[in-house]
């Protein structure tokens, strides 16, 4: 008969296998939820742009996801984590294929970068140059900062910990994903210029109201629901999952909605972007904050979006169609800072965070994004061009690029 210690060891591989399988399922569900968020990006843009650009919004988001998958699989994931997929399927499927679903999950984050940018450059950007920009951004620019923040690349995180007592903390990507996406979008929008006819010679703003409020609302709701996978599943293993993340996400969402409702004066566009502003901001500290801190974070984010969207469009004449710079860029940066404020034990948080480290990490993300955005879009504008010509823009991207509109006037019978 085998000794007791030997018998006790027999179930262990089975238990480990079960744990790996559970973690795979957990992360896979998160990846699917965040993948579904890309439908939200598509419908949010579709409902906001004019009718002649609706098809382009749908096609652009899906195409950008495909390009992102290729860029991240072959280049980006290696840049960020030093890992690659040039091994046998037998090796890749170890631990029930956990590393594979982790890649899938992180890919859905990476693909959010061009989805964010898409909303800012809508209605006048050329299709193929944007696909090239997507490949470069997801293959090189985004994973460069992702690796710094989430894989300790280049030694910034150890230095922050040694200097300030804590690393830069971004649990689910307020800065790594949203601020980076929003701050890349800003130079893209500036280099493209405003839509023709948006601003008149006498300084007035020509109104371009949303073409379809129901689709805009649908997009916002899809994003909101998927966000709970974005945040909660960022734990990446079942043993680290926390209900605090879910509740904080909820409270920030509510805070953003209420602030946008009041300051936006019941405007449906503001109200449906309000919860997104709150959720963008809470990503970084959702695992640290007290729910009241998360509520305040969301309230500030909702107000920040409404005020800065109005300023950029009306006073600064920056034609950011969906307001992705204030929504993702500014609210994401606020979220990185808020994690250092409301994550502190003095304000009911879990602690283990430094405001100085949060400020430095957030600023670092902004610098990388601005530099990468100007480099990529500046090179493309100087070489192949990034903007539709006046006639194409007048006709609309749907007819110009895709040869069909969202609602054709007549059918062709063969």
Language model regions located:
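Hydrophobic alpha-helical transmembrane bundles of multi-pass membrane proteins
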Residues: 8-414
């Amino acid at each position: 008969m085998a000794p007791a210690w030997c018998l006790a060891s027999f179930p262990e591989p089975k238990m480990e296998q079960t744990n790996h399988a559970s973690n795979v399922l957990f992360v896979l569900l998160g990846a699917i939820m965040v993948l579904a968020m890309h439908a939200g990006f598509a419908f949010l843009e579709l409902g906001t742009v004019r009718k002649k650009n609706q098809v382009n919004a749908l096609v652009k988001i899906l195409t950008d996801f495909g390009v992102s998958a290729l860029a991240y699989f072959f280049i980006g994931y290696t840049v960020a984590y030093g890992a690659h997929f040039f091994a046998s399927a037998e090796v890749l499927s170890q631990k029930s294929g956990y590393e594979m679903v982790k890649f899938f999950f992180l890919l859905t984050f990476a693909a959010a970068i061009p989805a964010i940018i898409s909303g800012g450059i809508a209605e006048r950007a050329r299709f193929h140059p944007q696909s090239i920009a997507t490949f470069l951004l997801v293959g090189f620019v985004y994973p460069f900062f992702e690796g710094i923040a989430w894989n300790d690349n280049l030694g910034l995180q150890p230095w922050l910990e040694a200097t300030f007592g804590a690393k830069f903390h971004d649990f689910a990507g307020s800065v790594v994903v949203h601020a980076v996406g929003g701050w890349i979008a800003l130079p893209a929008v500036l280099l493209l210029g405003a839509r023709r006819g948006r601003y008149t010679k006498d300084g007035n703003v020509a109104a371009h109201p949303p073409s379809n409020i129901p689709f805009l609302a649908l997009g916002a709701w899809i994003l909101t629901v998927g966000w709970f996978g974005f945040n909660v599943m960022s734990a990446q293993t079942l043993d680290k999952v926390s209900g605090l993340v879910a509740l904080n996400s909820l409270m920030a969402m509510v805070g953003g909605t209420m602030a946008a409702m009041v300051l936006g004066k019941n405007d449906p566009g503001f109200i449906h972007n309000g919860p997104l502003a709150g959720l963008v901001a809470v990503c970084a500290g959702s695992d640290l904050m007290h729910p009241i801190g998360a509520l305040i974070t969301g309230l500030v984010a909702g107000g920040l979006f409404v005020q800065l969207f109005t300023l950029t469009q009306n006073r600064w004449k920056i034609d950011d169609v969906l307001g992705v710079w204030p929504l993702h860029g500014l609210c994401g940066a606020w979220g990185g800072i808020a994690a250092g404020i409301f994550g502190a034990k003095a304000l009911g948080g879990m602690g283990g965070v430094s405001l100085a480290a949060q400020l430095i990490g957030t600023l670092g993300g902004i610098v990388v994004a601005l530099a990468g955005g100007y480099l990529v879009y500046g090179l493309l504008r100087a070489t192949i061009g990034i903007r539709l010509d006046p006639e194409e823009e007048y006709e609309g991207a749907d007819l110009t690029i895709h040869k069909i509109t969202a609602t054709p006037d007549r059918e062709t019978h063969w």
